[in-house]
Amino acid sequence: MSSLRLLISDSYDPWFNLAVEECIFRQMSPNQRVLFLWRNADTVVIGRAQNPWKECNTRRMEQDGVKLARRSSGGGAVFHDLGNTCFTFMAGKPGYDKTISTQIILNALASLGIQATASGRNDLVVINGEDERKVSGSAYKETKDRGFHHGTLLLNADLSRLADYLNPDPKKLQAKGITSVRSRVTNLVELLPGIDHGKIRTAIEQAFFAYYDEQVSAEVISPQSLPNLPGFTEQFAKQSSWEWNFGQAPAFSHVVDTRFIWGGIELHFDVLHGAIDRCQIFTDSLNPTPLEALAQRLQGAAYRPDAIDKICQHWIDDFPELQTELQQACHWLVEVLR
């Protein structure tokens, strides 16, 4: 039996790809060396310990249909589109060594005429003009008997969109968790016009085979053609769930405020595991009672616009004589929390 395994995903769904990655990692033989190549359509991928409300412009993402995906490894937030090629190297210990997988990527780039170097713990950089620019970022995960190294290569990504989704709204947000470090980046197409996913994928495959002096046939996987992956359905459900992608956020506080004709309101939220642990409302309204009632209702609710909207609608029903004013407040609150 070969010690190598090559998997290619035909899916652009980040939740599918991350679920496949996790299942293969858990079930692989400790003596195997696995290469998994994949791409995600418009997605912000965050590290295991990150806070999406701190890292991302969640409102803009929802408007533009950009998915949020939390990975099981550490590190920072990145934007993926089809101009990125994603790679995952997996191996059992003691064979797992992230310097080997880094070298395979460097060898693949060199075979295409691109001279890149490793920088720090996670990045690959190239010289573009007089500047050093990042073309690849990575993250890692290790267990007792195995490990994986995964990352992205910027081929022809829409770099203008990085600022759209990776700069959060200017909210009064105080949060714990790991903050992403923004780097100067460039696309490989700037160095090698005509490079595309097919070419870089082939180069990585050939560098993988050359390093281990062995070749295997690729296993192409998609939602219609899955390998035998026990537990995949459950893992996909987890990867695609609000509870994993948002609810795993570290504790944070969020303050929002606005002013209506009938008075100003300021809400202070303490959020723990994606739920409102504490809510305080301050107002100069002549009738603060409805807003005080809302603060009580929001306690324990999921910190998500649809859940808060549902609570607000029931709250409005309790004060029919103030329906217009409270609808204004509800609409504002749901929108500001997107």
Curated annotation (Swiss-Prot):
Enzyme Commission number(s): 6.3.1.20
Family in the record: Belongs to the LplA family.
Transmembrane spans: none
Record-given protein name: Lipoate-protein ligase A
Subunit description: Monomer.
InterPro entries referenced in this protein's UniProt entry, alphabetically: aa-tRNA-synth_II/BPL/LPL, BPL_LPL_catalytic, Lipoate_ligase_A, Lipoate_protein_ligase_C, LipoylTrfase_LipoateP_Ligase
Predominant location category: cytoplasm
Domain BPL/LPL catalytic span(s) in chain numbering: 29-216
Any one annotated GO CC term: cytosol
Residues where ATP binds: R71, G76, A77, V78, F79, K134
Organism phylogeny: Bacteria, Pseudomonadati, Pseudomonadota, Gammaproteobacteria, Enterobacterales
Miscellaneous note of the record: In the transfer reaction, the free carboxyl group of lipoic acid is attached via an amide linkage to the epsilon-amino group of a specific lysine residue of lipoyl domains of lipoate-dependent enzymes.
Positions bound to (R)-lipoate: K134
One GO BP annotation of this record: protein modification process
Pathway listed: Protein modification; protein lipoylation via exogenous pathway; protein N(6)-(lipoyl)lysine from lipoate: step 1/2; Protein modification; protein lipoylation via exogenous pathway; protein N(6)-(lipoyl)lysine from lipoate: step 2/2
NCBIfam families, per database record: lipoyltrans (TIGR00545)
Pfam families referenced in this protein's UniProt entry, alphabetically: Lip_prot_lig_C, LplA-B_cat
Subcellular location: Cytoplasm
GO terms of molecular function: ATP binding; lipoate-protein ligase activity; lipoyltransferase activity
Alphabetically ordered keywords of this record: ATP-binding, Cytoplasm, Ligase, Nucleotide-binding
HAMAP family, A to Z: LplA (MF_01602)
Catalytic activity of the protein: L-lysyl-[lipoyl-carrier protein] + (R)-lipoate + ATP = N(6)-[(R)-lipoyl]-L-lysyl-[lipoyl-carrier protein] + AMP + diphosphate + H(+)
Cited function: Catalyzes both the ATP-dependent activation of exogenously supplied lipoate to lipoyl-AMP and the transfer of the activated lipoyl onto the lipoyl domains of lipoate-dependent enzymes.
